[in-house]
């Protein structure tokens, strides 16, 4: 694509420094027609909130569930099918070994910790537990210790806030919770996303000891490959410069292609690289597929799951949620 411009347009861009996007933020791969101003937010979760509440950036990496909810409530930005983080979700829900939790239905009538009800990890996992294992999510008390990014959400009555001054990690330790999501999604951290995380160890067993095997089988059955990070662009930017969608898509695709070479050669050895190399055994050579065609089933599944969990007030057409940069 060749963009004929007298001068490049300036865009404020907030993306995490990931192995497959770093070539963009380092300036090694340009975004055609764009003079980027990269704004580093640590953790990137803080940028989600700033984008949703203040629409602070022209381009931002954001959690897809947060985005879909915000869009349903009229957020003036739209997503591109550039999914920069992905993982499966049979693993990552940790249980106290003394709580008698042997299967998902055992969570009914009990308290489970998740940072916020709309956290993408929680949404995907609840969807799996409901659809595949018959969990009645309304019979679980979901305990949160953070705000929802999207303030308009009307939370179900079975979502409660942790007591003042108590973190999910504390509650898990003393038996106030029988289960909680690992890492930043729940019991592996404390503190506000606007002020930085304090990491906490969470040495508890997974609900599913054979999670990897279950994830492989679920993917082969459904074709759904959960995404965790997507790129959004202000509506106003695309209204004035529609070509920006393709410029961004091509830049991110080139950066990923460069990274894939190192991934398959074995040269890439970060924890993230190792995770995605393992995922290639399930999803194929490209563990981060971009584009609408390749991701349509997964996008539809997330929109459906968010609505069923009462996170969005209405159903939305995929064309209202995503711009296909390959059709611009």
Residue ranges with predicted function:
Residues 2-12, 101-111, 308, 313-315:
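Immediate post-signal peptide segment of exported/extracytoplasmic ligand-binding proteins
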Residues 7-9, 55, 89, 108, ...:
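Residue-level preference for short coil/turn positions at secondary-structure junctions
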Residues 12-151:
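Short, glycine-/small- and polar/acidic-enriched structural segments
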Residues 41-60, 73, 122-123, 127-128, ...:
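Short helices/loops that flank or line small-molecule/ion binding pockets
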Residues 109, 226-230, 285-287:
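Short, solvent-exposed beta-strand edge segments and adjacent coil->beta transition regions
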Residues 157-264:
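Pocket-lining segment of extracytoplasmic ligand-binding domains
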Residues 220, 307-328:
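Conserved C-terminal helix/tail region of periplasmic/extracytoplasmic solute-binding proteins
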Residues 232, 237-308:
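Secondary-structure end/capping motifs
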């Amino acid at each position: 694509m060749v963009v004929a411009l007298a001068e490049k347009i300036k865009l404020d861009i907030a993306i995490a420094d990931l192995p497959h996007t770093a070539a963009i933020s380092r300036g090694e791969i340009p975004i055609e027609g764009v003079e980027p101003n990269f704004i580093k937010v640590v953790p990137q979760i803080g940028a989600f909130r700033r984008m949703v509440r203040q629409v602070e950036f022209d381009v931002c990496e954001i959690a897809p569930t947060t985005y879909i909810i915000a869009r349903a409530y009229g957020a003036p930005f739209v997503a591109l099918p550039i999914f920069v983080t992905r993982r499966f979700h049979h693993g990552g829900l940790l249980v106290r070994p003394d709580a008698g939790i042997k299967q998902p239905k055992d969570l009914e009538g009990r308290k489970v910790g998740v940072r916020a009800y709309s956290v993408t990890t929680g949404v995907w996992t609840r969807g799996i537990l409901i659809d595949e294992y018959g969990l009645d999510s309304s019979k679980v008390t979901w305990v949160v210790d953070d705000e929802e990014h999207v303030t308009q959400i009307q939370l179900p009555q079975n979502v409660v806030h942790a007591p003042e001054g108590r973190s999910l990690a504390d509650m898990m330790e003393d038996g106030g919770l029988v289960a909680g999501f690992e890492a930043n999604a729940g019991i592996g951290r404390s503190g506000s996303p606007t002020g930085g995380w304090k990491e906490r160890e969470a040495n508890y067993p997974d609900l599913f000891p054979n999670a990897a095997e279950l994830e492989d089988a679920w993917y082969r059955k459904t074709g759904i490959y959960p995404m965790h990070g997507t790129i959004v662009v202000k509506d106003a930017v695309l209204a004035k410069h529609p070509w920006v969608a393709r410029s961004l898509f091509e830049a991110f695709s080139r950066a990923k292609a460069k990274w894939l070479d190192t991934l398959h050669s074995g040269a890439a050895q970060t924890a993230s690289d190792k995770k995605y190399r393992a995922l290639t055994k399930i999803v194929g050579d490209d563990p981060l597929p971009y584009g609408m065609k390749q991701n349509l089933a997964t996008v539809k599944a997330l929109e459906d799951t968010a609505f069923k969990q009462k996170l969005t007030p209405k159903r939305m057409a995929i064309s209202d949620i995503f711009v296909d940069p390959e059709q611009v």
